[in-house]
Amino acid sequence: MYEYNFDDAPIVIQAYDGFRIIEVKGRQFIDCRDPKHMLLRDYFVAYLNNELDSEMVEDFSHRYPVSFLVDYIHLFERIDGRNRRELIAFLKEEKKKRVASYSARQKKGMVEQGDVETVFPAGTEVVFAEHDGGLIGGIIKAIKLQQSFWTGPYFEIKLSVIHAVKGEVQQGFYTVHMPGFYGQVPLTSLPLRKPTDADKKFLADRGKKFAKFWKPGTYCAYTGTLIQPSWWSARTFRADGRVVIDPISFERQEPEIWRNCIQSAGVSIDREERSKIKKEVLIRESDFWRCVPQLYGFSLAVKQWGRFEIDGMSEIKWRDDAWDKLVVDAESKDLIYSLVKFHGQGFTDIIEGKGGGTIFLLHGKPGWGKTASAEAVAELLHKPLYSVSVGELGTSTDALEKRLRNILDVAVIWDAVLLLDEADIFLEERDEHNIARNAMVGVFLRLLEYHNGVLFLTTNRVKKIDSAFYSRISVALHYRSEGKAKAVWTNLLSAAGLDPTWAEELTPFNVNGRQIKNAIRMGQTLARAKDRKIQISDLKRAVTATIRFETEMKLANPDEAIDAGPIQTVEVAAPKRKRKTETKSAKAASNGV
């Protein structure tokens, strides 16, 4: 179908009793605007409405393009009297001319703008090459020639495709735009073409991935960009990592971003053919080639909702050995594993609707496995890990409630392990002088009361926890540092492909697990800088730098170092000089200097 801009003055080519032929910008129309021509217009509307969408017929207003009408001569055989004879005679003559002209162009492989619908009639299988080089496969539903004030004429092409924007596989439409053109151009220069065998294979392979990942709650790996379109532009995020496909939660939690995503992608639902594909069959293999190239969900890496390209999706390569390498006592590991794996299979509460969640409180010095425990058990059980920092929850009561409620909701829907790291601000005992923080703690307590999922809370300040949390916490585990260093060094050295026997020599350095990981990365960088293999001396150098920094921070801020533990004595010149200076000052003070 076509739409035209009639702002330019028409040129009358020929006038008949019942209609007249006009030309606008080189294109011919049958004009029925004059009151004496209204009878023919009524015939057009009546007969065309039987064959076409009434909305498409209304687009023509009083002027019908001759190039369109010549394909519907059979409909006008029923028009009475002289009007019919004149109209059919004119259209047949025009069709003869157009067929001859079109045949001549076709032999040369050329097309005019008016040929597009003839070359690609409704029902034609096509592929469309988008401006970024990506291919869309589909079946032509309709073509409209539109007019833009900014860009001039363009074709709006509606393709019948397979999508899952509502969380179920559906027939739908994918709208693409093709620039208009003047004169004759090679058919091969158009981004719209009939698919080759290679096109079909490429699109079918992508469609298989669509069939694998479309279902809401699917957890997969992703390499590529997350896109959040807006009216004028698009926000993009490098989202390498793991994602959860969930268009339903996306639409509920971020309706504006969701709406922009769908509109910019040109996806719409075919309400007449909705749900024709049976859910138990999922998608027929013959339809793989016309599955849309995007899915919608949440990136756990950048913590954003948006659109993902299917080409970047893959199955997760699980690190099942992460649990075995976790340096935590056997009893604690068994408790965590059992409660997470069989969560939700026991007694919940007498009051319906109250939470049956499992809440862990992991406390102890930094760097000794609290965060790693949540990560490792999620990896072992192949569940999503949704890690949240306090800063993501907002600083006001309203923001906290909305954000935390959304997070808890999707964590349950995805059967995810939820980790709220360094949750001290929400766990600390309430203070009658700090009303704002008291309100936030109250919101936090209430939402935990009704949470049905698995939640890990970590803190370094267990002694300051508000007593109201005691009954909300299912299990509290204390993470100690004593006797773990050698095992942590051994595991991390092995994971990095280094000699695990180095652990014996490195264990005396008083560093935690997180610092050990950083030291190994720093040591590898030092070795690469010298273009040689890493040596134990590189690790010692890295560890010494870490300890020097920590020592200086403790001496500068003694109040902040109360819970940090003793520092391993190492040959670090700067800290020793500082201690000596302080000792002399203290001695002078005692002598009354």
Task: Locate each region found by the language model.
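AAA+ P-loop ATPase mechanoenzymes
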Residues: 1-347, 357, 394, 530, ...
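Hydrophobic face of alpha-helices
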Residues: 88, 333, 441, 517-520
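Walker A/P-loop NTP-binding motif of AAA+ ATPase domains
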Residues: 322, 326-507, 590-593
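Short, polar/charged, Gly/Pro-enriched helix-capping and turn/loop motifs at alpha-helix termini
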Residues: 418, 458, 499, 530-534, ...
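C-terminal domain-closing interface element
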Residues: 428-431, 566-576
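AAA+ P-loop NTPase nucleotide-binding core of proteostasis motors
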Residues: 468, 477, 552, 556-561
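Conserved AAA+ ATPase small/helical "lid" subdomain
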Residues: 477, 496-547
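Intrinsically disordered, polybasic Lys/Arg-rich low-complexity tracts
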Residues: 576-588
